[in-house]
Amino acid sequence: MSTSGPAAPGDVPALPPPPPGPGSGPAPPAPAATARDTMDGRAELPIFPRAGVPPLAASDTVPAVPEGAGAARPAAPPRPTSFSVLDILDPNKFNSRRRRCVLLGPVVPATCAPCAPAACVAVPAASGRSPRAELERRALSAATGVAAAAGAEPTSAGDSYRADEAEANGYSSGSGRSPTADSEDEAPEDEDEEEAPEVQDAQGTEEPRGGSGGLGARGSGCPGAAEVEASPVDDTAAPGPRGNSPGAPGPPATATGAGSAGSTPQGAAVTTKPKRKRTGSDSKSGKPRRARTAFTYEQLVALENKFKATRYLSVCERLNLALSLSLTETQVKIWFQNRRTKWKKQNPGADTSAPTGGGGGPGPGAGPGAGLPGGLSPLSPSPPMGAPLALHGPAGYPAHSPGGLVCAAQLPFLSSPAVLSPFVLGSQTYGAPAFYAPHL
């Protein structure tokens, strides 16, 4: 180095701790000759950019802009590479692409199809070199200018360190596969059985080659990297369609394996999804009829009393009864049809047009009242009916509580207000419990 007076500022890299002041960024362009001398020795190259740390932000986006006029002259012009400074600054992306291409060798285009193909094409030119030497050579070739050296050299050191760390963790080709690849290759036996035999052969040839089934795509910035990492079916068991398009994995595996590392939950999800569909189709096709109407106790009591009065309802009677019981007319009509069918089975040859009276068939509500004296006509007063209804009512209810219901059920020939008003008055006068309140 020169020790003359004008060149004293050029000795700043040799000083022990150069202060990185705010104005030290634009300072290096002045001593261009001394910078050229320091560029001749590669050993001092990492020391020089320490004084110019602020220009690092500019070097992220502008690839190689030399700060001095003679700063880029000693180095050869940069040879065209397929990556930019942003690729160097992304260690995971750069490391995974380089390692996958170096490990798999000549079959790079077929294996790296999900990634950008240009990133893997430039590597086989120097396939004879070791991964670390290739990494350092790329970093040095990209660091022709001082600004590019400031952005690339520390990152390249970190790149090589991360590559060594990845090899120590077991991600190299010799020691074995990554834990993700191990877990992916073990579990999906059931899915592999469903694949074609030639696909299984392709899988068997691909696994021993580098053992990095889920390694190359994991951590890379490719579009389909997430799908390839998450779905072992696309990564190992289906190499054929993988070369068609970058982001075109199989729909079932992508849907089920979106966020899971292992493939055991994926296999369960893949197998259970058709089961869910089959269950839904069975419930629709196997059970087309809807659920039966669940009648409450007071609705059954009122319907039975109405059936004892008459087995056939007119339109007005059916409407009034449906309104009083909070049912639809269809529900009332169907209940009466079923009740008539049951009554005909229990009383063969009986006159269906005559009112049933007190001697109705032993249905759910008419059985206990069959032997009571007197065939009760539809217009009978409610007190005589309280006794037969109390026999089949709940044990806790008093004898007069169903009597209020019978008033409305046993007066079918009155007008609509007359049918509803005895029901309301009866339930309030006789002190019916709150159990009947919703139907008032």
UniProtKB/Swiss-Prot annotation:
Residues 182-198 have a biased composition (Acidic residues). GO terms for biological process: lipid metabolic process; nervous system process; regulation of generation of precursor metabolites and energy; regulation of glucose metabolic process. SUPFAM superfamilies: Homeodomain-like. Residues 170-181 have a biased composition (Polar residues). It comes from the Eukaryota. SMART domains: HOX (SM00389). Residues 1-82, 145-291, 342-387 are annotated as: Disordered. Residues 210-222, 356-374 have a biased composition (Gly residues). Disruption phenotype: Homozygous knockout mice for Sax2 exhibit growth retardation starting immediately after birth and leading to premature death within the first 3 weeks postnatal. Mice do not exhibit any obvious abnormal behavior or motor skills. All mice show normal suckling behavior, but at 2 or 3 days prior to their death, they become lethargic and show signs of wasting. The few homozygous animals surviving to adulthood are fertile, but all the offspring from homozygous intermatings die within 4 days postnatally. Residues 14-31 have a biased composition (Pro residues). Residues 288-347 bind DNA. InterPro entries: HD, HD_metazoa, Homeobox_CS, Homeobox_NK-like, Homeodomain-like_sf. It is found in: Nucleus. Gene3D superfamilies: Homeodomain-like. Belongs to the NK-1 homeobox family. This is NK1 transcription factor-related protein 1.
